[in-house]
């Protein structure tokens, strides 16, 4: 999570185009794993090149997103311990807002990936000769996608509760200050 990062910079779009049996991949930022993945890839069936590449990239992409979620968990834990030790300070509130912004970006990305997965499943299942391993990969991707959706929902709810707690702490502190000033 970049300090002061803009929402647009938190996501990387990947566009796949198929033109005359060639797969063209466009990204805003260079994704290091794509060339490495393609150079080490062994095709099961040359006739299903596009399908295999798309599924392989989606698998790797989902793995990267799960790692990102682990990083978010660490950031949430850090924020939680900051609140416990120092109270609701301005930097803590800024960190909370940054995390919430990042959660929005992740949620949007996951929804887009789920739609892409729906498209892939719809188009692959119309192919009569789809093999068992391809179906298995698609099912695993759906399971991973559902898991990420549940995790992101849980983290978002937790951050919302943290925000409420911070607001309550600030309100309490202001009330105590006003009470002290009134007594003076």
Question: Each predicted region: which residue ranges?
Answer:
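Extended alpha-helical interaction modules
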Residues: 1-94, 108-114, 118
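Membrane-associated alpha-helical segments
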Residues: 78, 88-184
């Amino acid at each position: 999570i970049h300090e002061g990062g803009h929402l647009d910079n938190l996501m990387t779009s990947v566009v796949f185009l198929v033109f005359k049996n060639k797969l063209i991949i466009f990204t805003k930022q260079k994704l290091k794993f794509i060339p490495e993945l393609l150079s080490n890839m062994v095709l099961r069936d040359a006739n299903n090149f596009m399908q295999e590449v798309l599924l392989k990239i989606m698998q790797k992409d989902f793995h990267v997103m799960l790692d990102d979620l682990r990083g978010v968990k660490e950031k949430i834990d850090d924020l939680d311990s900051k609140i416990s030790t120092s109270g609701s300070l301005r930097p803590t509130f800024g960190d909370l807002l940054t995390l919430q912004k990042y959660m929005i970006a992740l949620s949007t990305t996951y929804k887009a990936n789920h739609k892409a997965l729906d498209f892939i499943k719809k188009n692959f299942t119309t192919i009569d000769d789809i093999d068992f391993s391809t179906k298995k990969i698609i099912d695993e991707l759906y399971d991973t996608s559902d898991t990420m959706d549940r995790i992101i929902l849980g983290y978002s709810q937790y951050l919302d509760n943290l925000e409420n707690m911070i607001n309550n702490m600030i309100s309490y502190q202001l009330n105590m200050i006003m009470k002290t000033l009134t007594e003076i």
